[in-house]
Every structure is written in C-alpha cells, then in structure tokens.
C-alpha cells in the first residue's frame, strides 16, 4: 500500500514539470482590454488553480495593483504586453510575498525597463528569466523527490504503518516548508537592498 502511495506521490511531483505557465511567445503582442487580460490569464494558468472557482486574476486585483503602484496605469483602458509581464510576476510573487515586498522588487525593474527604448524591456527580461527557470524545473522536481524519500526514512522506529506514514508525510511537508521559508527569508533580505537601487 505504501509503495503505491509513494509512486503516486512521485508521479504528482513529476507532474509539476507539466504545470501551465505562460511562455514568452504566448504573450499577445498587442494591447488588451482588462477583460481580455483576465480571460487570457485564466485560460493559460487554469491548471495552477487549487479549486475550480479560484480566480487567477480579476478586474479588482488589476485596479488594486495600479492603486498600489505595482502596475503602471493603462493607456486608454488598454494594457500593453509589458503590463502583462508585470501581472505575471505579481501573480507568481503574491503566493509568498507581501504586496509591499512585491512593490519593492518590481519598482526599480518597472522604472528601468517598462517601455524602455534601450533594447532591453520587460518582455526581454521575462524571456531571460523564463528560460532560466524552465531549465531548473527538473532540478526542483528531483530535489523534492529526494526530500520525499528522505522523509520516508523518518520515524522508521514506529511500528504502526498508519502513524509512521502520517509522520513521514508531516516530515515531508516540513522539509518543503523549511525550504520555502529559507528562500523567502533570502528574498525579503534582498528586497531591503532593492530600496537603494
């Protein structure tokens, strides 16, 4: 029974390699209205929803991002491809960072690269970052599988299978959580220095 569970868990971790994300060449190269942006994001990121009714992006969110200076104002109610890139970064960051931290991270990037004429703009920044993260996904999956196997060795002295599995699952969750906590702490420390750029 536990072998099947372990195989299922490894399959789940490997499925992360197939999660929906928006590739740079999928970002429309035209300005879009807010409804078009929310539809686009919903269509392309639906597999990352935890529950079917979850919203990836709403009009209210976009308006709040603009009010909080995370997103430059639209131009005649239309949003450029670079607005879309910022919305993607916000979408990914908001899962683990505060709005203030996101603002600190994006402000210098937006200031320097939003509608930049010097050859590098937010689209080229996204392309570079996307490529690097895409290449790292296999490493991340292998690391999680290693942590799963290591967690399965925890509590080996417990004879009750159900109790041991419960505790080894908890150990796996704690291992992943610790990894997230450490990385989040590093990001927050870097964010402090961002205010000086």
Q: What is each stretch, according to the model?
A:
Residues 104-105, 109-181:
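Exposed, interaction-prone assembly regions rather than primary DNA-binding/catalytic cores
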Residues 2-111:
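Basic helix-turn-helix/winged-helix DNA-binding cores
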Residues 195-196:
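Conserved small/polar residues in nucleotide/adenosyl-binding loops
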Residues 86-95, 169-190:
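Short, hydrophobic/amphipathic alpha-helical patches that form generic packing surfaces
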């Amino acid at each position: 029974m536990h072998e099947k569970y372990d195989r299922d868990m490894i399959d789940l971790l490997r499925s992360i390699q197939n999660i929906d994300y928006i590739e740079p060449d999928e970002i429309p190269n035209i300005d879009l209205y807010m409804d078009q942006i929310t539809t686009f994001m919903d269509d392309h990121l639906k597999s990352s929803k935890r529950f079917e009714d979850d919203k990836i992006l709403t009009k209210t969110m976009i308006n709040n991002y603009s009010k909080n200076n995370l997103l430059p104002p639209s131009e005649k109610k239309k949003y450029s491809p670079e607005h879309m890139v910022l919305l993607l970064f916000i979408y990914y960051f908001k899962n683990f960072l505060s709005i203030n931290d996101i603002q600190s991270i994006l402000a210098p990037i937006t200031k320097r690269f939003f509608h930049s004429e010097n050859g590098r703009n937010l689209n080229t920044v996204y392309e570079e970052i996307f490529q690097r993260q895409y290449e790292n996904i296999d490493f991340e999956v292998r690391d999680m599988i290693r942590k799963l196997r290591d967690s399965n060795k925890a509590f080996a002295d417990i004879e009750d299978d159900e109790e041991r599995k419960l505790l080894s699952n908890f150990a796996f969750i704690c291992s992943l959580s610790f990894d997230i906590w450490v990385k989040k702490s590093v990001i927050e420390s870097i964010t402090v220095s961002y205010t000086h750029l």
